[in-house]
């Protein structure tokens, strides 16, 4: 142990040295004196907790030094608000970023423990579900790595979204008990508590308004450390949990009415129990709105309090603070900040509004109008009456300004109003975000272009300078360095150094070696090892044995109709039919792998999961197929599972209907790991195509323009079915019970041949034909490996470091901590 003076306080303290012997002693110390466990009796999980505490000691100094540097240098801060942060396991990521992974591995070797087994004990934090949360997590990693003064805000969900189990082919939701593990990684902040209020009434007191709420709960803070790569900067992710306060009714309890004694407490604390409560009921919608306001109220109060501690005047808030809204869930932050500035700080309405418009920025993640969040005016008025007042005032201010310009007719004004008067009076949250933000960005070039010509076309006429693009990215530290150790060694060797982890553009040097037979062979071994790892997982967890020489065809993402997992199933069924018709043909064996969760209230998505499993049951047990097709559904998709699946992919499916996917980031992760894309011209597929070339990915289906033209002309899916016998047979088999003989009509609504909103029938033939081209390509081993290497070599643009640099330059106007402001390690 080394005695050292902490730069931010002047106190002497003992700082553990990052060597294996010291770490070993620290782990044992934590086990005995912090956890109170005899090392001879300790479980692998207890060893993990001790190791995490030892690692936290090493990281805590960076964390506190970073915070002090922000304060001492009066740095402008960005605060990132998101309902989701899909972090994945933190322990190994932190050790690699801190540069002490080898030392911890050696320490456990000295202890006679298998380090990999200990690491496997860590649960994925239940803080997110899909791409929205994973993007936020990648951004946190890049913010810390790039030394950006930043802080994330989210909710500490007690039960996550849910743990997915597959029972009789169907999704069953179970509580995700991730908080049952000890949380060595989080610092409780009992001094950071804020009151979050609901309901009541608003009193008009002359030129002021006073909100008198009827309900109040407390938000308590926990800080998760996010260490940057290189171990110099660490930023916080502040997570809020709901506490009801002193609501336990002792009188009821003493009378034996135990349920009544805790009813109010349980009701209030439900706010932070589950991510995305089922909103198919009135009570579910109310809980979800309360959850969103809970996040923004606690976060905005904290942001204002932090500013007032650092700066003498609240009026400089817009100069020192940027608040970013990740999708529409946190958009209530706009009226919440207005409420604080006007009601609590005494700032005039117009000045407060001008401050808000400089502070907020908003990322849009969807082009589907039905997915844009809206809330009933009556519900918002009942739960948040003061905020509804402010929203009305914002809307009136905006619409009056439009009318004053004089170039916009009444119909235009109606379309851009925050209040939708045509569907039962609803507050359009995306509209509020656009009006209250100084920048609105899409997340892929095609998405940003479509954003200003479709859902926000009217606003683009009013605020043409407000809209911009920041193409998403992913962190190579997790998606190569952690997920794919074999590829990491391969890149270190052939790029000549480890610098690609921070400068992903360095991957382009690999372009010089894509034709080298020895390099191709070496890459083939890396891919084979990854496939064997996944095959072992599938056999261990599901009892299904797969052929690792087969082409691994993978679609892993949230289950949704627009993502078109059903089209993938249609291809599988068609291939099944063709093999039975022509068993002597030299077929390319394929393993089709699915993973992803369906929202608990999403009937059709859950039906698609069941269809996949029913098709798998029939095909996997048909001996005539001879393992030429194997279909696998892996339950409970998570970041940790993705880290096993993605490196093993040969082909990845990005097959959403053109014009519906914002960017997608799984396509970037797959390409970074040497998988080839089967996709439509949608989202980031377009930009990946530009980078890797048409010979190194498979594009099929109609373009955005063709999709729109088909709709304008009156899309008739039955006409496609009538003229394509293969398609007709597939539709009939699925809808008439070939894969569900015990319930023949089970899937007669899945393909919806009379509606087919996502145009599966229109894209079917192109999809099938393109799949056979991929078969031919895969059989040419050298050509396939060359294409895979070209994909890796040209993914440098898709680093989340580049995305964050774009945000800092073009949207947040944030500068990183300099070496002088936060000195590196000696």
What does each of the following model-derived ranges do?
Residues 2-826:
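A conserved ligand/cofactor-binding region detector
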């Amino acid at each position: 142990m080394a005695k050292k003076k902490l730069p931010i306080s002047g106190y002497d303290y003992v700082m553990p040295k990052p060597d294996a012997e010291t770490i070993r002693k620290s782990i044992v110390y934590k086990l005995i004196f912090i956890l109170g466990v005899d090392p001879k009796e300790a479980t692998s999980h207890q060893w993990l907790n001790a190791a995490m505490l030892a690692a936290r000691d090493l990281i805590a100094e960076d964390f506190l030094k970073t915070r002090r540097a922000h304060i001492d240098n009066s740095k402008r801060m960005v605060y990132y608000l998101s309902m989701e942060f899909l972090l994945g396991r933190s322990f190994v990521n932190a050790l690699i970023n801190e540069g002490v992974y080898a030392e911890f591995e050696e320490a456990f070797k000295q202890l006679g423990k298998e380090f990999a087994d200990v690491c496997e004990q860590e649960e994925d934090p239940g803080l997110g579900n899909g791409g929205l949360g994973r993007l936020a997590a990648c951004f946190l990693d890049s913010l810390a790595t790039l030394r950006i003064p930043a802080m994330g805000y989210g909710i500490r969900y007690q039960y996550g979204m849910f743990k997915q189990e597959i029972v009789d082919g169907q999704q069953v939701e179970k509580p995700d008990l991730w908080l049952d593990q000890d949380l060595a990684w989080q610092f409780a902040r009992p001094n950071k508590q804020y009151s979050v209020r609901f309901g009541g009434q608003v009193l008009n007191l002359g030129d002021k308004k006073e909100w008198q709420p009827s309900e109040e709960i407390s938000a308590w803070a926990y800080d998760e450390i996010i260490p940057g790569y290189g171990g110099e900067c660490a930023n916080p992710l502040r997570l809020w949990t709901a506490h009801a306060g002193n609501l336990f009714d002792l009188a009821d309890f003493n009378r034996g009415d135990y349920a009544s004694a805790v009813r109010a407490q349980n009701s209030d604390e439900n706010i932070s129990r589950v991510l995305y409560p089922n909103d198919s009921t009135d009570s579910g919608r109310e809980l979800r709105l309360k959850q969103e306001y809970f996040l923004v109220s606690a976060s905005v109060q904290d942001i204002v309090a932090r500013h007032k501690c650092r700066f003498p005047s609240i009026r400089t808030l817009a100069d020192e603070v940027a608040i970013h809204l990740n999708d529409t869930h946190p958009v209530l932050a706009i009226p919440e900040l207005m409420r604080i500035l006007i009601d609590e700080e005494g700032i005039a309405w117009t000045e407060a509004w001008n401050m808000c418009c400089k502070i907020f920025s908003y990322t849009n993640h969807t082009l589907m109008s039905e997915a844009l969040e809206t809330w009933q005016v009556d519900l918002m008025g009942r739960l948040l009456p003061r905020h509804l007042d402010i929203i009305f005032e914002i809307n009136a201010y905006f619409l009056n300004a439009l009318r004053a310009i004089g170039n916009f007719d009444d119909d235009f004004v109606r379309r851009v109003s925050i209040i939708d008067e045509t569907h039962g009076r609803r507050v359009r949250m995306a509209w509020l975000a656009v009006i209250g933000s100084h920048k609105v960005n899409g997340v892929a070039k095609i998405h940003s272009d479509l954003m200003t010509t479709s859902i926000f076309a009217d606003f683009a006429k009013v605020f043409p300078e407000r809209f911009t693009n920041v193409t998403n990215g992913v962190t190579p530290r997790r998606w190569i360095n952690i997920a794919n150790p074999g590829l990491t060694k391969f890149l270190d060797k052939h790029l000549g150094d480890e610098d690609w982890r921070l400068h992903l553009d360095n991957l382009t040097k690999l372009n010089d070696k894509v034709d080298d037979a020895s390099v191709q062979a070496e890459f083939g071994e890396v891919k084979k090892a990854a496939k064997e790892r996944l095959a072992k997982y599938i056999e261990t967890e599901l009892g299904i044995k797969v052929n690792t020489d087969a082409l691994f065809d993978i679609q892993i993402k949230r289950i949704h109709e627009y993502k078109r997992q059903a089209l993938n199933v249609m291809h599988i069924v068609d291939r099944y039919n063709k093999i039975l018709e022509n068993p002597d043909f030299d077929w390319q064996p394929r393993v089709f792998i699915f993973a992803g969760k369906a929202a608990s209230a999403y009937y059709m998505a859950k039906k698609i999961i069941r269809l996949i499993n029913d098709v798998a049951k029939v095909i996997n047990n048909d001996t005539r197929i001879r393992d030429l097709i194997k279909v696998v559904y892996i339950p409970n998709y998570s970041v940790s599972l993705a880290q096993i699946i993605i490196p093993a992919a040969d082909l990845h499916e990005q097959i959403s209907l053109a014009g519906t996917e914002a960017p997608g980031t799984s396509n970037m992760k797959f390409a970074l790991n040497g998988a080839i894309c089967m996709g439509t011209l949608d989202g980031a597929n377009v930009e990946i195509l530009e980078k890797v070339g048409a010979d190194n990915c498979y594009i099929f289906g109609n373009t955005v323009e063709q999709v729109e033209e088909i709709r304008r002309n009156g899309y008739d899916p039955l006409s496609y079915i009538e003229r394509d016998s293969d398609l007709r047979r597939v539709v009939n088999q699925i809808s008439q019970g070939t894969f569900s003989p015990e319930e023949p009509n089970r899937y007669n609504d899945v393909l919806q041949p009379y509606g087919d909103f996502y145009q599966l029938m229109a894209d079917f033939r192109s999809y099938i034909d393109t799949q056979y081209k991929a078969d031919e390509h895969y059989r040419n081993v050298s050509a396939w490996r060359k294409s895979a290497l070209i994909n890796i070599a040209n993914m440098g643009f898709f680093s989340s470091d580049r995305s964050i640099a774009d945000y800092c330059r073009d949207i947040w106007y944030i500068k990183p901590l300099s070496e002088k402001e936060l000195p590196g390690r000696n």
